[in-house]
């Protein structure tokens, strides 16, 4: 039984019976946890207004089985003010985390990166793409996706900014004479290593790489947040 307060955010919620919710949280000490929020769908439930995305929460839960019960949830601060593109980008981040995080596995450093990501989305709406790419690289590192962007995987030589490298899953980047969807310029790889996405071409290459690297974690099922983005803002999907 867990009695202490824990910091967390709502990642996803779904109906459970006529009056309750199952809620996926991302917590600082326990990673992703799924809790039963009893009565949270009732009109007068204090949980109804509290269990919203992008609100920093203090949580308590109890129980001995796999599915534990949320006993208390309070806002730790005001909801982060997401607007339009930032809002859908935040939903995208939440959906990806809900899919890729192991249940009840702590990711304390990633939790801090998530908090920074959400804060930046709320306060820097013109920097959405660099913010998302930065978090995706941080997330891949937290998941154990060990790619060295500064070393050629075949030779061990330092990556040259002027050369082209082909990405090979489970191996890394090797020097290549080819140019296709799996190849990247050395200068871009070195920028990836530093999380430097100030160059537009590097930013586009980073998006191509993260889509490629996240695919094994996300599977073939389309992201609902991306579909929603396409239907509502078809001309601005580039932001996610």
UniProtKB/Swiss-Prot annotation:
Which residues constitute the signal peptide according to the record? none
Q: Which InterPro entries match?
A: ARFGAP/RecO, DNA_rep/recomb_RecO_N, NA-bd_OB-fold, RecO, RecO_C
Q: Which UniProt keywords apply?
A: DNA damage, DNA recombination, DNA repair
Q: Which GO terms describe its cellular component?
A: bacterial nucleoid
Which segments of the protein form a coiled coil according to its record?
Answer: none
Pfam families this protein is in?
RecO_C (PF02565), RecO_N (PF11967)
Keyword Nucleotide-binding in record: no
SUPFAM superfamilies (UniProt xref): ArfGap/RecO-like zinc finger, Nucleic acid-binding proteins
Instruction: Tell me one GO biological process term.
Output: DNA recombination
Functionally, this protein is described as follows: Involved in DNA repair and RecF pathway recombination.
What's this protein's family per the entry? Belongs to the RecO family.
- Identification of the protein by name: DNA repair protein RecO
Q: Which organism is it from?
A: Actinobacillus pleuropneumoniae serotype 5b (strain L20)
Classification from the root reads:
Bacteria, Pseudomonadati, Pseudomonadota, Gammaproteobacteria, Pasteurellales
